[in-house]
Amino acid sequence: ELDLAFELAFAEDDEILIESFLDGMEVSVGVVDFEGETIVLGITEIVPTKEFFDYEAKYEGASEEITPARIDEATKVKVEEIAKRAYNSLGMSGFSRSEYIIMNGTPYMLEMNTNPGFSPASILPQQAKIYGISIKDLCGNEVEKALAKNKK
């Protein structure tokens, strides 16, 4: 199977990327700079009804999103620390939503989305609501930061 996969991949390009399959719980973590503090809004567990969390799963309800995620406190703390560290290390200042797979209590970062969805079905607004921050306040915070930056 691997030889055929290589053949198909190299038929498309002369470079390919091979990654290990991470079999674990998928979580999404919202992080924002709110009133001068880096805040983890929440950790949402993604329970797909399909094999992958694709467009249908994300926007057409083919997955269950559980906030807060069903993880132990030690894992929660690890995920929050990594999410904050990644956000700050990348010099982020607005909204972000990062994705992780948790295997045996170890979080593996998959990606960071710097332009997360803001529809009522989107994860970040749901996390903000649970955290106690309204969308109005979240967006107002961004406007205030932009105005302050332009005054400099």
Q: Where do the PLM segments sit?
A:
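ATP-dependent carboxylate activation and anion-phosphoryl transfer catalytic cores
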Residues: 72-152
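Phosphate-binding site of ATP-dependent enzymes
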Residues: 1-81, 108
